[in-house]
Amino acid sequence: MKLKYIMASFLIGSCTFISSCKDDFADINTNPTIVSKPDPRYLFTQALANFDGHDYFAWYYDYNNMLRWSQTVASTGGNENLMTTMSNSGKMGSQVYNVMNQVNELTYIVNTTLEGEEQAKYTYLKALCQPLMIYLAMWDTDMYGSMAYTEAYQARYGGTLTPKYDTQAELFDLWEKQLKETVETLANDVTIDGNKVTQQSLGSQDIIYQGDYTKWLKFANSLRLKLAVRLINEDKNRALNIVRDAAKYPIMDGLEDDFFYNKSATDRHMPGGNSMDNRGAGSMQLINFMLEHFDPR
C-alpha cells in the first residue's frame, strides 16, 4: 500500500515537472519579432496605408465604367456590346475590407484588453475608423449596390464566415448614425467621473492630419454632406435634416482641411503607366457643357 502512495506521488510530481517544462518551452520558443498584441495606433496607421482606393483597379475598372455610363467620356475605341456588363469587383470594395481588417482588430484590442481611463484614451481613435470605411464603402455601393459590411471580417471574433449583404438603404441608415456619432464624439471631451481624459496622441502615426482631431471632425462631418447628396432625390426632407444638423459643426472649407493622401515620393500615379489616354475622350455632352459655361479645363 505504501508503495502505491510512493508511485502515485512520483507520477504526480513527474506530470507537474513535464507540464512546467512545456510552459517554459513555449515561452522560450516565442518569436520576439512577432507582435502578438499590436499597438492600436500602429493598426490605425496600417488602416490608413490600406486606405488608398484610387489605385490601379479604381482607374482601370471603376472609373472607366462610371465615366462612360455617365456620358462624361466616350471610349476611344467605340462602345462595345459589353459596355454595360460588369465583369469585375470594384477597387473601393476590396480596399474597404483591407481597412476593415485593421479597424476590427483595433476595436477588439481596445475593448477587450484595456479598461477604465486607459481604454477611454482611445475613444477618439476608434471614432476615426468609421469615416475611413464609410468613404470607401460609399463609393462601392454606388457602383454595386448591396455589400457585406456589418457582419464582414468578424469570424475571428466569434462572427460568421458567411456575412449577410446589407442593402444600400440599410447602409445609408447605418452610416448616417455612425457619422453623426463620430462628429459628436470628436466635438466633445471624453470624461470619467467628471474628469477629462486626455486622448492618445497620434502624431506622425496619422499620415493624413498628423493627429489633428479637429480636422478629422471636419472630414467626418463633410462625409455627412456626401451622404445627403445621395439621398436628396430619394428623400429630400431627410437629406436636408442631415445638412441642417451637419451645419452645427465645422466642415472642410479650405485647402488646409484637404484629406491629402500622400502615397509616396515616387509611386504617385497608376501602376503600369501614367497615361490615361486609353480610358476615353471627352464626350460631346461634356465638351458642349464646358464650352457653354466657359469652363477653362
Please name every model-derived segment.
Residues P38, A239, V243-R297:
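Extended ligand-binding clefts on enzyme/binding-domain cores
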Residues M1-T30:
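Bacterial Sec-dependent N-terminal signal peptides
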Residues T72-T150, Q154-G194:
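Conserved, well-structured interaction surfaces
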Residues C21-S87, S94-Y97, N101-E105, T112-G116:
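Membrane-proximal, proline-rich intrinsically disordered regions
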Residues L136, M143, L227-A228, E234:
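TPR/TPR-like alpha-solenoid repeats
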